[in-house]
Amino acid sequence: MASVAAVLLAGALVVTLTEGSGQASGVTYVGGDNSQQVYAAGHRALAPDFTGTSLTGTPIRLASYRGKVVVLNFWGSWCAPCRAEGPTLAVLSQQYRSKGVSFLGDDVGDTTANALAFTRDIGIGYPSVNDASYSIVQDFSRVASVGYTPTTVVIDQTGHIAGLVIGKISYQSMTTILNDVTASR
């Protein structure tokens, strides 16, 4: 009887862990529910600082962006929703540059070659950190619901998490969050 219960429990765990995952051309991704959250100024968690290396070999440190709004997108070349949202993020990065908003990517689980091909194919011109070990994802998951790919975090000028989109972003969801955060300067 105990072994039957163990098998049922293991099956339920597999279903729970795979629920929300998507399948695209045989490549999996960790799907979110496309929810968005905006945090009031007094209720924002401090974003964890990180240091990493960009896909082109340049050092990147989040703290060096203090004083600017930062959009940090967690993505992978293997992720179909990441491919779908990439062109929108590229457009937004150009549109909000004059408003002092910087965009960064956190490439999770890719080789540098695959990640560079992704950014080239999608037209992403902003830097991305190679996070093959998922260490930045793990640090952010301690303070926000970062555990799905894609997830996009908006960090205010003081380094606090002002907004979060779990799953694929839309142009409207991001402009709403960015207009709110940039207006509160």
Which residues make up each language-model segment?
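Structural microenvironment flanking redox-active thiols in thiol-disulfide oxidoreductases
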Residues: 83-122, 132-139
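Thiol/disulfide oxidoreductase modules built on the thioredoxin-like
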Residues: 117-125, 131-185
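N-terminal targeting signals for export/organelle localization
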Residues: 1-47, 185
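Conserved redox-active cysteine motifs that mediate thiol-disulfide chemistry
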Residues: 66, 74-91
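Hydrophobic beta-strand anchors of alpha/beta hydrolase catalytic cores
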Residues: 71-72, 103
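Active-site-proximal beta-strand/loop segments in catalytic clefts of secreted hydrolases
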Residues: 74-76, 106-109, 131-132, 166-168
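A short beta-strand-turn-helix
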Residues: 41-44, 49-70
